Amino acid sequence: MKLVLTQEVPGLGSPGDIVDVADGYGRNYLVPRRYAILATRGAERQVAQIKRARDARAVRDLDHAKEIAGQLSGLSVRLVSRAGKEGRLFGSVTAADVVSAVTDAGGPALDRRRVELSTPIKSLGSHTVAVHLHPEVSAKLTVQVTSA
């Protein structure tokens, strides 16, 4: 059975892909849940329209990610946290803390899932944090953790 996917289906494809699946899988799962529609001539035209829209969105997303990376490139953020005598923090600095500090410093709004901390920041000092904005674009920013 040939279907046109309308949503992302893990292991099968992305919206606009024409896939060949077993009749039962298509009829009982994909079509009723509106993950796919039957592949007809009208659906194939719709696929072409979806692909054009997806390509335009990909270009727009890449440009937006490059713009945000430019804003983050020279940004240094300062976080104040309580710490012990040896410079170890009571708790840790998380990705959400970094995002709120960037926003407070006048930087762009970020999603905390885009901020990559290899390990939580648990000490005072300067730390470099990677922000993955797009599969092709990432930026690094400096987080300065100081004692309260």
UniProtKB/Swiss-Prot annotation:
Domain of life: Bacteria
GO aspect biological process, one term: translation
GO cellular component term of the entry, any: ribonucleoprotein complex
Keywords in alphabetical order: Ribonucleoprotein, Ribosomal protein, RNA-binding, rRNA-binding
Pfam family, one: Ribosomal_L9_N
GO molecular function list: rRNA binding; structural constituent of ribosome
Coiled-coil ranges per UniProt: none
UniProt cross-references to HAMAP family, sorted A to Z: Ribosomal_bL9
Protein family according to the UniProt entry: Belongs to the bacterial ribosomal protein bL9 family.
Protein name from the UniProt record: Large ribosomal subunit protein bL9
Native species: Parafrankia sp. (strain EAN1pec)
Gene that specifies this protein: rplI
